[in-house]
């Protein structure tokens, strides 16, 4: 049985405010493989209280996130969010592993399009549309990558 690769969640706001750098090489990248392994195992260890996770929450200043979706979760490399302005925004309560016990009221777009590279053998740029909770999670995690704390 393989050992779980779980990292401690970063709670220092000064570390979380640093914008993350893009992943350059998408294939045969040992650092990317390491980030994804730790991100996945750390998420699974916290999934009862976690809907997504950004690489900088576990100590990597790289643009990689994990977002829970209906069918499990998706790893997004270098994600870019394009909001659907026509559908507007909504304010809801959110919490965050990096700020245990705190609840924030955050206004987010109801629908978004995310452009990203998947973590696959053929990391071809993909575009997916998300609504509702998945859209909110995606925006929350990309905020982490941008050093935005709410």
Where are these regions (language model features)?
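Positively charged
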Residues: 1-150
């Amino acid at each position: 049985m393989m050992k779980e690769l779980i990292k401690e969640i970063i709670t220092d706001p000064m570390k979380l405010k640093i914008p993350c750098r893009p992943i350059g090489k998408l294939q045969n990248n040992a650092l990317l493989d390491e980030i994804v392994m730790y991100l996945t195992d750390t998420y699974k260890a916290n999934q009862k209280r976690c809907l997504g996770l950004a690489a900088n929450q576990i100590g990597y200043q790289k643009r990689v996130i994990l977002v829970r979706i209906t069918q499990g979760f998706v790893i997004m490399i270098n994600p870019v969010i394009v909001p659907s302005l026509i559908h507007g925004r909504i304010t809801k309560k959110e919490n965050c592993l990096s700020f245990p016990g705190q609840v924030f009221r955050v206004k987010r777009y109801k629908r978004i399009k995310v452009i990203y590279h998947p973590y696959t053998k053929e990391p071809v740029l993909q575009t997916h549309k998300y609504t509702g909770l998945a859209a909110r999670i995606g925006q929350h995690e990309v905020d982490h990558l941008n050093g935005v704390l709410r």
